């Protein structure tokens, strides 16, 4: 299982995407969901697939690199392998 995490420069995003700039995050979410990624939090997306996982990361990076406003506003983008993904939300909330 692999994940993608990215950070965008908001001032550049506002200029390149326009207002409301936060809709850009919805657009990215839709694109990544089409490639099998699920939004977890912030700008972190996980692909839970057991097959061709690195290929899915490549497809996602390739797709994102074709979005002009994303290319101009991305500050950092990382892909990483997830060995264990534990949800501690209930422990914290109870």
Curated annotation (Swiss-Prot):
Homodimer. Gene3D superfamilies: 3.30.70.240. Belongs to the VapD ribonuclease family. The keyword ATP-binding does not apply. GO terms for molecular function: nuclease activity; RNA binding. There is no VapD ortholog in strain J99. It comes from Helicobacter pylori (strain ATCC 700392 / 26695). Signal peptide: none annotated. Cleaves ssRNA, mostly between U:A; cleavage is not dependent on mono- or divalent cations. Can cleave RNAs as short as 6 nucleotides. Keywords: Hydrolase, Nuclease, RNA-binding, Virulence. This is Endoribonuclease VapD. It holds the Pfam family CRISPR_Cas2. It comes from the Bacteria. Transmembrane segments: none annotated. Its EC number is 3.1.-.-. It is an enzyme of class 3 (hydrolase).
């Amino acid at each position: 299982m692999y994940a993608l995490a990215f950070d965008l420069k908001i001032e550049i995003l506002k200029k390149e995407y326009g207002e409301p700039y936060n809709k850009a995050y919805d657009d990215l979410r839709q694109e990544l969901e089409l490639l099998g990624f699920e939004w977890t939090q912030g700008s972190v997306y996980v692909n839970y697939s057991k097959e061709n996982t690195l290929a899915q990361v490549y497809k996602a990076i390739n797709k994102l690199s074709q979005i002009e406003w994303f290319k101009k506003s991305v500050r950092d983008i990382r892909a990483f392998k997830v060995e264990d993904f534990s949800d501690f939300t209930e422990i914290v909330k109870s």
